[in-house]
Amino acid sequence: MIFSKLGSSLARSSRSKGFVYGGGVRSAVFNQGRLRAPQNLEAAVNQVDGGLGFLRRHFASFAARKGLEAGDLSRAFANPRLRRFFSSQTPKKKNYENYYPKDSKKAPKNEQKSESRDGSKKNENENAGDAFSNEYQNMLIPLMAIALILSTFSLGSREQQQISFQEFKNKLLEAGLVDHIDVSNKEVAKVYVRSSPKSQTTEEVVQGPGNGVPAKGRGGQYKYYFNIGSVESFEEKLEEAQEAIGVNSHDFVPVTYVSETIWYQELLRFAPTLLLVATLIFGARRMQGGLGGLGGPGGKAGRGIFNIGKAQITRADKNSKNKIYFKDVAGCEEAKQEIMEFVHFLQNPKKYEDLGAKIPKGALLVGPPGTGKTLLAKATAGESAVPFLSISGSDFMEMFVGVGPSRVRNLFQEARQCAPSIIFIDEIDAIGRARGRGGFSGGNDERESTLNQLLVEMDGFGTTAGVVVLAGTNRPDILDKALLRPGRFDRQITIDKPDIKGRDQIFQIYLKKIKLDHEPSYYSQRLAALTPGFAGADIANVCNEAALIAARHEGATVTMAHFDSAIDRVIGGLEKKNRVISKLERRTVAYHESGHAVAGWFLEHAEPLLKVTIVPRGTAALGFAQYVPNENLLMTKEQLFDMTCMTLGGRAAEQVLIGRISTGAQNDLEKVTKMTYAQVAVYGFSDKIGLLSFPQREDEFSKPYSNRTGAMIDEEVREWVGKAYKRTVELIEEHKEQVAQIAELLLEKEVLHQDDLTKVLGERPFKSGETTNYDRFKSGFEESEKESQKESVPVKPVEDDGIPPLEPQVVPT
């Protein structure tokens, strides 16, 4: 692993190759005259060029001195990168010459490339100091690894032989071969021996293991060593041994005490500290790339911990090919008109200033998810000829205290520098929540500080004109009141789910990108009638799913059948035909869905049925019935009562025709309970409760009515649901045979449409005087629109009481 890191680090740049394979005259890397600071890149390379060549030759001489052969080295260092490092051959250049021979293909040359090459050389010369420091940073770890390897070899092949004191006394001291002794660090006695006894006789010459190390300033060679317990006992034993063999005290073996520093032991002692420092340095470098500062799309690279206070701003690219314009946004014409006024003011401010008008400081885009708030902001960026800065509300929040306000200041500072400009803050509720909620400190303090800084920047002493702030959220109810006041967000632009005309326009935009077998208008009219309550994101998902289904079935074009399957996929979930269901359960599901279909068919105010199926979908639905509701802004008591009866049709069919009830009606009962509680406690339909309204609040622990009133509401809801279920059971018993026929058809076909129900049940006894969404789905609605415009009489618009348009009703089992 060390060799791999070593080879990859040394082969990182072309400049390091010369450093590795340098030699000759330039290998004098320790020349003091060359340790001056380099003036340019060439000087820097020449200064470090011969360093590893010197190490390579030193290693080769070391191997030769130890008697190592090339085969031993190749077996020891089988790593190809290490062999390439110690090779004297220059490696191949990393360019296209390795793939295309020079004679067969030549790279094109032109003046532009030569100019860029000259420019790059100039930049290299200008940044010679940085390159020089980078070279040494890259070489630091490999040099340390080489030093560790060399020290391991030198330690592993120790020349000296360890002996005991008795062997020293009998073989060396008595033979007169001891020249002198060095005691290192009061622990090890190093014995330096002569080649012949002191009496110059060569009869008993002791041969040591290999060549010894010559002593400095004395005779003898260092060949043996032994450990001593203490200095006093060693001196006593040595003196007694010399007296025993009759050595004169003047001829005693000289003993020298030396203090030596073993560098690798010191390195091991400081290894934990060095490891901690290296970890801190590595963490600091990682933080430079991962914390704060400008980054991401449109930001600057190389952000560091010291730039953490800078906002992560995304600037709109004026030259982008995928720009979005206002013509690409549909279904929200009123909101689009409001936003376009900001763009027109920034482009032509004099027109408004002459009239004495001031541009609003900001606009808050409010609406359910998927309605196109961010898409409208992208269109603003594409249409406006002024700088557009976008950021997410969560980008202001960080683990460090004070980062949020600093990023707010940095954001507005950059916006003022390029004024007139537009700032878009997506999901502003991340920092704009009302202050003081819960009374807790901690993370709320940092968020409130960020909010306070945003309030000051939008409308404070240092506020300057020319900066417009747009923000998007789907939770305007939790925003701080100071943020919503005029002077900061002057306008609140509500973007609701599109109506049938808006869905038609949105479908036409997305259908233009799909290969169809008819014109886009043919599908857009029918699909708009089929998808009430769908937002723009849902419509885009339906179109994409239809294209995917067509590709899955190897279709040349996308047809209406593919769109039907896509809508079923979006509403009901993934189709699961392979789910194991028993015959009894399948029969129960069929009668349950048949009860829904028959009950809705014979109820005047029930929504027309589109289709019913017993194919399992999603995670829990064993079947469902799909209706095409009309987008009524107002609902009457009779309409809600009929819808309650229709929802209870499945449970009534199980009881009447099968004779037992199942858990399949759990979702139906949940809808009925919620609907009935709304009629009694919210809409004021109950005579017992009176004209009171208790809408559901977030605080469920306290209720705005007494326990007695709550008991009355519960009793009234139970009574209303009982009446609805009794009426539904009577209806199912009256049409028992037809319910059974439809159930058997479902078991046979699995999917029934309205035409199949008409054959069994006949025409629906109730016909609406107005065009329904189902009629628009069958034949389009352009002609009916023209007729209604001729006969229409202007009336005062009725104010909506907060009743949302009805979505497609899916009744899972």
UniProtKB/Swiss-Prot annotation:
Residue span of the annotated presequence: 1-86
Residue ranges, annotated region (Disordered): 93-129, 764-813
Localization in the cell: Mitochondrion inner membrane
GO terms, biological process: proteolysis
Active-site positions on this chain: E593
Recorded GO CC terms: chloroplast thylakoid membrane; mitochondrial inner membrane; mitochondrion
PROSITE patterns to which the protein is assigned, alphabetical: AAA
Binding-site positions, ATP: G367, P368, P369, G370, T371, G372, K373, T374
Basic and acidic residues bias: start-end ranges: 94-125, 764-790
Top-level EC class: hydrolase
PANTHER family recorded: AFG3 LIKE MATRIX AAA PEPTIDASE SUBUNIT 2, ISOFORM A, ATP-DEPENDENT PROTEASE
Function of the protein: Probable ATP-dependent zinc metallopeptidase. Involved in the assembly and/or stability of the complexes I and V of the mitochondrial oxidative phosphorylation system.
Stated name of the protein: ATP-dependent zinc metalloprotease FTSH 10, mitochondrial
Species the sequence originates in: Arabidopsis thaliana (Mouse-ear cress)
